[in-house]
Amino acid sequence: MKSRPLHIAMYPWLAMGHQTAFLHLCNKLAIRGHKISFITPPKAQAKLEPFNLHPNSITFVTINVPHVEGLPPDAQTTADVTYPLQPQIMTAMDLTKDDIETLLTGLKPDLVFYDFTHWMPALAKRLGIKAVHYCTASSVMVGYTLTPSRFHQGTDLMESDLMEPPEGYPDSSIKLQTHEARTFAAKRKDTFGSNVLFYDRQFIALNEADLLAYRTCREIEGPYMDYIGKQFNKPVVATGPVILDPPTLDLEEKFSTWLGGFEPGSVVYCCFGSECTLRPNQFLELVLGLELTGMPFLAAVKAPLGFETVESAMPEGFQERVKGRGFVYGGWVQQQLILAHPSVGCFITHCGSGSLSEALVNKCQLVLLPNVGDQILNARMMGTNLEVGVEVEKGDEDGMYTKESVCKAVSIVMDCENETSKRVRANHARIRELLLNKDLESSYVDSFCMRLQEIVEGI
């Protein structure tokens, strides 16, 4: 089959972790001669532009996000709202459906990549466009929670059922704690935008796709992908690790100067992504745990619920006690550049798939502190299956961590003489070497492009 350049439209969920993940794949596809139309709102475009390494092949197409009652003015992505308001962002995204149809009719792409817009496959089919579900979450999570064997158990699934993986799941060691299973069970009854149940939205998006794609490699997630393929009776492909090319900008001076004042590998960096807003007690235990380590730390976290700024949420006397070695910042940061900084030796991560992919190719050690959803199962895979990080201990019933448990996990990974640390470091080094193998990545992207050609040609 003779290959030809494809025209691919992209419309990811309006969260920066999803947006950047899609764009990083675009960069890999553009190198191979494919044309990309990346549909995104203006605020997201401004943040994404430095990461567009092929502007002649990747074009941003502006979509205006309509206002929905309850959202702040000009809210365009989840970064503009607190976690409880994310369903309204989803509703706003659903309201762009007619505009998306108009855009796709004019653009005439061969394929459209999507994730949360469950209406996209039907729309694409009507326009003669192939629909690719590109999942930024791990196949570990999808296999555990969203496959037909689990989905058809319905909304009355018990917590005890969810504490164990579904029948046929490839890894019996990956399980949920009581508080996590309770949250997952409740989530099955939650709507997420436009009065659509969250799990209905995700299941339809997966079940009606022409192709299911995951940002991973089979060496890490192969058994989970095979399980999903059998469950949905659909082709499931890996795009490869999609290693991030360095952004075209330098690290902001305030961060590079601050980090430059410490020894190599000595700084603890903590970031929970653009979507996570901690409860006040979680925020307090986190920052007090960082203080307790006695190590220099940079924490990029949003102000907790009920607070306007991170400064106003600090415990009394905290800033004075950590002056010179502690930096708590409430805004968006250039995480990829921070993780690559030689002073950073540890990364406390919420285990979002994007953050993990950035972390695994760097040398910093991983402390796993998941918050919601797929992050929890990502943490189990990283901590229990791959053993490349140490998860912060939480109460089984309440899911609460303490300053001591935060400090303990950091202290373990930062102590190169600790037996757990030695094992984690060795496993991380092995995975890092695998992911940084350019031949591996290139072969995956080439194979993925060939699969896209076959889907378009109907093979």
Curated annotation (Swiss-Prot):
Pfam families: UDPGT. It comes from the Eukaryota. UDP-alpha-D-glucose binds at residues 136, 333, 335, 350, 355, 358, 374-375. It catalyses: a flavonol 3-O-beta-D-glucoside + UDP-alpha-D-glucose = a flavonol 3-O-beta-D-glucosyl-(1->2)-beta-D-glucoside + UDP + H(+). The active site is at 18 (proton acceptor), 115 (charge relay). The keyword Nucleotidyltransferase does not apply. Expressed in leaves. Keywords: Glycosyltransferase, Transferase. Its EC number is 2.4.1.239. InterPro entries: UDP-glycosyltransf_plant (IPR050481), UDP_glucos_trans (IPR002213), UDP_glycos_trans_CS (IPR035595). The keyword Hydrolase does not apply. Signal peptide: none annotated. Flavonol 3-O-glucoside/galactoside (1->2) glucosyltransferase converting kaempferol 3-O-glucoside to kaempferol 3-O-sophoroside. Has a broad in vitro activity for kaempferol/ quercetin 3-O-glucoside/galactoside derivatives, but cannot glucosylate kaempferol 3-O-rhamnosyl-(1->4)-[rhamnosyl-(1->6)- glucoside] and 3-O-rhamnosyl-(1->4)-[glucosyl-(1->6)-glucoside]. Has a higher preference for UDP-glucose than UDP-galactose, and no activity with UDP-arabinose and UDP-glucuronic acid. Represents probably a recessive allele of the gene. This is UDP-glycosyltransferase 79B30. It comes from Glycine max. The gene is FG3.
